Amino acid sequence: MKLILTADVDHLGSIGDTVEVKDGYGRNFLLPRGLAIVASRGAQKQADEIRRARETKSVRDLEHANEIKAAIEALGPIALPVKTSADSGKLFGSVTAADVVAAIKKAGGPNLDKRIVRLPKTHIKAVGTHFVSVHLHPEIDVEVSLDVVAQS
């Protein structure tokens, strides 16, 4: 059975790909779940248009991610004032992704989603310089230098 995928399917293909599958797999799994449509000339044209649109969107997203990367790198090290214990210098709590996003925004950087900030495996619980990764695009990550300082 020849089908055109309408969603990414593991070990089979991505949106717009024309695939040949066994009849039972197509009829009982892919078609009822809306993961594929039966291949025809009209459906193939539609799939080609979707694929072209996705490729142009990917290029636009990559360009936008490069612009954001340049803006973040231009900021340099970002200061993040936090409340600390007076005697030990340890933080009350830890630095979160939302704190990092707010610090970038306050430093004059772009507004980011906290879900794209990748904190180190060990929590940031001490004053000092820490490095945080920002995942802008599947091909682009930005390393941000974060200076955690005691709030005065």
From Swiss-Prot:
One Pfam annotation, family name?
Ribosomal_L9_N
What processes does the entry annotate via GO biological process terms?
A: translation
Q: Which GO terms describe its cellular component?
A: ribonucleoprotein complex; ribosome
Q: What domain of life?
A: Bacteria
Keyword RNA-binding listed: yes
Any S-S bridges, and between which cysteines?
none
Q: Name one GO molecular function term.
A: structural constituent of ribosome
Please provide the record's keywords in A-Z order: Ribonucleoprotein, Ribosomal protein, RNA-binding, rRNA-binding
Report the PANTHER family cross-referenced here: 50S RIBOSOMAL PROTEIN L9
NCBIfam families for this protein: L9
This chain's function reads: Binds to the 23S rRNA.
Question: What is the similarity comment for this entry?
Answer: Belongs to the bacterial ribosomal protein bL9 family.
Query: What is the protein's given name?
Result: Large ribosomal subunit protein bL9
Highest classification ranks of the organism: Bacteria, Bacillati, Actinomycetota, Actinomycetes, Mycobacteriales
